[in-house]
Amino acid sequence: MIEKLEELRAQWRKLQQEVENPSLFSSTQSYRERMRDHAYLSRLMEEYDRYLLTEKQLEDAHVLIQDESDADFKDVIRQEIRTLEAALHTSQKRLKTLLIPPDPLQEKNIIMEIRGGTGGDEAALFAADLFRMYTHYAESKQWRYEVLAVSETELGGFKEITFSISGRDVYGSLRYESGVHRVQRVPSTEASGRIHTSAVTVAVLPEMEETEVDIRAEDVRVDVMRASGPGGQCVNTTDSAVRLTHLPTGIVVVCQDEKSQIKNKAKAMRVLRSRVYDLEESKRQVARARERKSQVGSGDRSERIRTYNFPQNRVTDHRVRVTLYKLDAVMQGALDDIIEPLCIASRESVI
């Protein structure tokens, strides 16, 4: 590991000289990429320096205790050695984690899709609750979000909603939210007070730039129509809604929230690029295709990654066996105690 870290230190020094002279780069994109690499290596070198310092302090402590004759002072040194050994172990674990090459998608913005699955109106209402949960979380991180497409129910729920979240490390934080979310609660329409179980699916896609996904104009069929609201009633007198069909893959995206056809088409293209990228990436990586299928599935209640139990104020993530009895806070966006263990488990599985 030390040999690898010394090689990376040489790369970091070279990169440090390069980023100080932006004129050497052929494009803004290449400069951004090098800055991202420099930031990663800087974090790694900072931890490596901490590791080396702790290692030297531990060596000095071992030498000191051999030369010391005072029993009380020896006890003090032994305690210091135990503290330094623990710090060295922690630093070593951090280095192993940091040595995992960063995912190029880590810093991407996302397109998030939430759909009501099993449970009818109650599933649609919970889909709306999840949307609010994620937007509260985004606000707490000072991220921005924008609704791209939504299909509402007459009770105020969402059959489905598609929205973007943009900011620092968005995809890296929220990528593990993909999957089936199960809710157990008494619906407001339930007179007998029985607990119902419903399911909602969440898909998280990295938002791709136009230059990153090749979609030819002739491969996209554009249909325009009048926007519709809950129950199917017409809510617009002009053909502002847009449906894009990607002919090679059959992917269909509909956007109708904006009054402008041009704006709806632009939003639909953002979603289409991300869906096409996700499909192509799944084909290239069979393992990822299997993971995505197991996460998203059909929305059936038997396929779940997380359960929200309202009567017990409990939320359980079944992948990392995390159970919290503060569902009320989670639904207001307090997700860090769930998201952080997922990120840690993912990194540790690669080490």
Swiss-Prot record:
NCBIfam families (UniProt xref): prfA, PRK00591.1
Protein name: Peptide chain release factor 1
UniProt xrefs under Gene3D superfamilies: 3.30.160.20, 3.30.70.1660, 6.10.140.1950
Family: Belongs to the prokaryotic/mitochondrial release factor family.
Modified how: Methylated by PrmC. Methylation increases the termination efficiency of RF1.
Annotated compartments: Cytoplasm
Pfam families in the record: PCRF, RF-1
UniProt source species: Treponema pallidum subsp. pallidum (strain SS14)
InterPro entries attached to this UniProt entry: PCRF, Pep_chain_release_fac_I, Pep_chain_release_fac_I_sf, Prokaryotic/Mito_RF, RF-1
Alphabetized UniProt keyword annotations: Cytoplasm, Methylation, Protein biosynthesis
GO cellular component: cytoplasm
Keyword ATP-binding found: no
Main location: cytoplasm
Domain of life: Bacteria
Role of this protein: Peptide chain release factor 1 directs the termination of translation in response to the peptide chain termination codons UAG and UAA.
GO molecular function: translation release factor activity, codon specific
Modified residues (N5-methylglutamine): Q233
